[in-house]
Swiss-Prot record:
This is Alpha-latroinsectotoxin-Lt1a. It holds the Pfam family Ank. InterPro entries: Ankyrin_rpt, Ankyrin_rpt-contain_sf. It is found in: Secreted; Target cell membrane. Keywords: ANK repeat, Cleavage on pair of basic residues, Exocytosis, Membrane, Neurotoxin, Presynaptic neurotoxin, Repeat, Secreted, Target cell membrane, Target membrane, Toxin, Transmembrane. Residues 1-35, 1196-1411 form a propeptide. One of its GO terms (biological process) is exocytosis. Residues 1230-1254 are annotated as: Disordered. The lineage of its organism: Eukaryota, Metazoa, Ecdysozoa, Arthropoda, Chelicerata. Expressed by the venom gland. GO terms for cellular component: extracellular region; host cell presynaptic membrane; membrane; other organism cell membrane. One of its GO terms (molecular function) is toxin activity. Homotetramer in membranes. The H8 helix is predicted to insert into membranes and form pores by assembling into tetramers. The helix is contained within a helical bundle domain that undergoes significant conformational changes during pore formation to allow exposure of the H8 transmembrane helix and transition of the toxin from a soluble monomer to a transmembrane tetramer.
Amino acid sequence: ACSSPEVSIFHFFVYAGSFVKNFKKMKGSSAISKREMSRADQCKLLAYTAVGYETVGNVAADIASIEGANLVAAPVAAGGHLGKGLTDAAMIAMDCSSIPFEEIKEILNKEFKEMGRKLDKNTEALEHVSKLVSKTLSTVEKIRVEMREGFKLVIETIENIATKEIVFDINKIVQYFNNERENINSRQKEEFVAKLQEPAPGNFLLYLRNSRTSESGTLYSLLFRIIDQELAIPNNAGDNNAIQALYALFYGTETFISIMFYLVKQYSYLAEYHYQKGNLEEFNTNFDHMKIVFQDFKFSLIGINQNTKPLVDEVLNVLNNVKNKSFIRNVQNKLFYDLMKQTESLLELKKEIANMELPIIDETPRLSISISFKERSDDKPVDTPLLKWDKGKEVKYAIQFEQDGKFSKISSWSKPVTVQHLACPFISVDKDRRNRLIFRQFGDQIPELVGTLRGSQVEFRDIHRDLYNAAQVPYAREALSISRTLIQNGANVSETFELGRGAIHAAASAGNYDVGELLLNKDINLLEKADKNGYTPLHIAADSNKNDFVMFLIGNNADVNVRTKSDLFTPLHLAARRDLTDVTQTLIDITEIDLNAQDKSGFTPLHLSISSTSETAAILIRNTNAVINIKSKVGLTPLHLATLQNNLSVSKLLAGKGAYLNDGDANGMTPLHYAAMTGNLEMVDFLLNQQYININAATKEKKWTPLHLAILFKKNDVAERLLSDENLNIRLETNGGINPLHLASATGNKQLVIELLAKNADVTRLTSKGFSALHLGIIGKNEEIPFFLVEKGANVNDKTNSGVTPLHFAAGLGKANIFRLLLSRGADIKAEDINSQMPIHEAVSNGHLEIVRILIEKDPSLMNVKNIRNEYPFYLAVEKRYKDIFDYFVSKDANVNEVDHNGNTLLHLFSSTGELEVVQFLMQNGANFRLKNNERKTFFDLAIENGRLNIVAFAVEKNKVNLQAAHRGKTILYHAICDSAKYDKIEIVKYFIEKLNESECNPLHEAAAYAHLDLVKYFVQERGINPAEFNEENQASPFCITIHGAPCGYSLDCDTPDRLEVVEYLSDKIPDINGKCDVQENTPITVAIFANKVSILNYLVGIGADPNQQVDGDPPLYIAARQGRFEIVRCLIEVHKVDINTRNKERFTALHAAARNDFMDVVKYLVRQGADVNAKGIDDLRPIDIAGEKAKAYLQSSRFLRSGHSFQSNEIDSFGNTIHGISMSARTNDKLTQQISSKGTRSDSNSTEGKMHSENVHVRSIDVNGALLLLDFMIRVFASKKTNFAPYGSRIKTRSAAEAQAEALIMTERFENLLSGLIGDPIPDSIDFSNVHSKIYKAIMSGRRSVISEMLCSFAEEYSKLNHESIKQLLSEFETLTTTKASEIHIEESVPYAPFEICELKVNSNVSQIK
């Protein structure tokens, strides 16, 4: 069943929906048949997520201390997965076991083997290295696990030929690394080491070390091929090929980092392994390997200086390059967004690696050892033979540095010395700030640590290790005799060696309590002496089953509850775990013993004692008061463990002692749950016979009952036993609404279905996702169940939440008999799911001709029904290349050349999506490849437009297109090359130019016009095209074309960051930035002006282009004004300081040019900026003389033109600013004064537009003082605030009467124009402008300028009558006055009418609209 259903039916039952969606985007529009994925892949995708792995890993650590942990861990991990995972009835029906039991067991076995290989902690000379590397490796592997599915997707869908080859090679390396690593990790310690040390050339570690070299085919070289060839830089938002390459680059880089830390970890392990074995030469060799690998890979990853190309930096540069692409926000590729989430992790790894140093001492000790057997007066000689000290045997020594837990390599051995009649020589070494560890070796025997010199110590006697060795001699008398001799000759009973263990620990391990007594007599503190892991002599004796030594230590008042460091074991934990009954009995007889002490996982000695054959458990249950219901950290009680280990006798003892039968663990799993899951019928029977057992107990989150689990795990005998119990509730549901009938139907258990229905199970009940038992029975393997369910009243038209009916499933799965049954019971053949998918779509998509025939014969109109993606049955048959269904549809008059509303045939559609196999299928079956759509495009055109190189190459190479045929006024080849450049399809461009050696059009011009940087670089760098060249045929240079952009482009405004990037790139290749770049002799500057490219113009000037260089006698400013390029004009004047009155060869200014063409925004701007409105060009023509209608009206309305001349010099106002353009006569002309002072006087212009233009001009004529006063007035009106101009008072110069008169005139005129522009003709008689002028004049002369605002308020009564539009106009005027945007004016919410109250105006309903 799993091998055939189509994705669209199930949507992977919601869980895989997003994966399918993105998979389809990667492949194109084709549907995905489930037959394309293996069952294992489907099940993994649906069920086994990272949640499961995390659960398993945690359980392995928690359970590891239990004897028989492998029996317990898998069910507990499965229970955790059930509690957190994505189990669903539909998944179960597909026979994708919702709990991947075998995978869980496999992972657990690896975890336990890893623990079994773990070397004795704290013997580790490289312990800190191991911790550091393991932590980073774990981080990297987590990222790789998260990215693994995405990388598989890339492998399956990648199309680009160049990228595909590289990615496949990367995949080979990745797969070999993953597989061989798993192979090695699955082995026990000795085999593991042997595998790591295989001789060359098959040595795995050597192979991995080679991956950082630049040799062809290595991982490092492959990653740099992607980088150097820029395969990971997308050209547009739809460039999936580049996104795939980017993903492969990132995943490959993470693998490269993983390889680095894996190598360091394994060389560290090997070094430590040999250190503990005493193979010091091998330790040194692997120490060097570890160090060199770390340094080499670190250099490759992050470099050491600016001259290197470190991999991580290069990858981050690529990522940043991609992120900065302007189109990147339009990318719809899930892989890309997944990748962006991981970018931060790569940055963190880079920092971590950069700051990382191996915690080692990178210095090998210089051998400087003196060995002396000479007798000394203050030390007694020790005669040979003694232990290893035999006459004639050679002995030698070596040194190792240690400081703060860091270790060095070991020095070379000293020259061997032959032992004579004395043992235990004196050893002298050089002084050093670091500790010096001294090793000795007799002949070819294993070296051993004999002492440590600390600080200023330079000498010691090699006798202490001999005491340690003597304490563990198996013969008690001999051990005691030698130990006594050594102690008498100066051996230190407190000296420690490997693991921090001394002679007392050795005696405990061997059970030599006489030696123990001798040692304690010398130093009673040895009684509680702990080694580096916290093991005391009592721990060691208990774990070694040395009961006599245990009793000896207890007799000396040893602490029986002492705990180890990390595991928190007491001696009783160790004895119980190993089922050591005598030691256990000795310990529990002690009054002070803590029977319920919990280790780091929360297990008590009772927990650890329970195994399949434990006798200790019975002792602890019967003979002690141990708490029997105590829980571990994961909530396991002793009864849970007894159930999981199938220990019925202990279970009975626990139940008899009052164990809580219904206690759940952390996930709510009771002992009965575990018994049902594991199929332990005898245990289930025992538990069900207990008085208070809860057969309906549910887990915490998912609410699984024991019956659910028995059915789910197909433990049929257990399920039937549970069904026989009268207390069972068969209608209980999980939190997903799954009841036992759903599970029985899904798993194909007909007998259970029959029994459940006999007990009145509800056949119509739906799960929370809308699945009925009938749905699940159809999906399942047993085809008898649907017939039985239908007979019992199942609804044949039930819909899942996704709208899928049983008929959909039967059609998609090809179950014709069930399909006929459903039809006979009234199933709706036109039922649609949420994607408008009908059963006919499912049948076609999955290749079930028999069902297709049934449906079409029943209703021929089904031939034309479309789903939400506009796919109709014939389309799907073509897409899936099902020849039998295709032929059937053709026999029913389906037309392979039928067109849609856009004129596209199936060949067009599948060419667009790059489905080469489908295109081939269509052509083999009569598709006409010459047909054109409504845009006159063939399948070949669409393949080019969408970058489908595979279709293009097929069409060319199979002669499906005549490249020399006429097409749109040129040849097909011409348009093919130009269009591929236009649409930024670099691979297709390269195909034509490199493979076919064709270059009929000039593709660089197209690439430049559309600002495709990568294509431009390709033509300039690889093809050697000169970007500055132009001629009669190519009338503009590529550089010029880049600046200007496509004639119409994709938008009218092509001034984008992409285009500027291309300009920046090409500007370095241009010999003269001020040179001509087209046949009309334009410069780059003038081209930027014609194209209205402000940012490009700014860039060009910034790199040396001359903003004043004339073209055919016209300066750039004149050209910009002539073209109406307002922003260009403004930029030239304000940013690049071009003279506003610069003239062309006919002495015309920019104002002439703008006025002639009625470009009013430019005209107004130039006037405001002080352009000479009376400038005369050829024939004494002023701007007004050649102006268009609008410009002429505007210029006429300006009172600057009322006198025959303008200022000969500029006046300096009271703030030191120049007042431009004020007519001298305007300040002294009495006639004008009379005119302005007369009541109701209007502007000369009858045009409202003229009035507004005029007053816009005047605002530039008021000096700063006047502008500030008007601003004060406006602020009062609009914000209920008064601007304080006091700071400026001291700088106001005294005015002459003429000056004050002129200023008052200007301000009065300004106020008049403001009002007339706002409220229109006539201005009420109540406003006397001569009076206004008089008061302003007096205020100026008196120096009391602050009263002007109050005075203006008194004349503003008419403002209270403004309507909404007038208010908007007023705001606009205020913007002109102050450069403050009207939208920025804030009106206090609490005082909306305050502005009007200040001027004591009438308030009406319109006033609130000011907001």
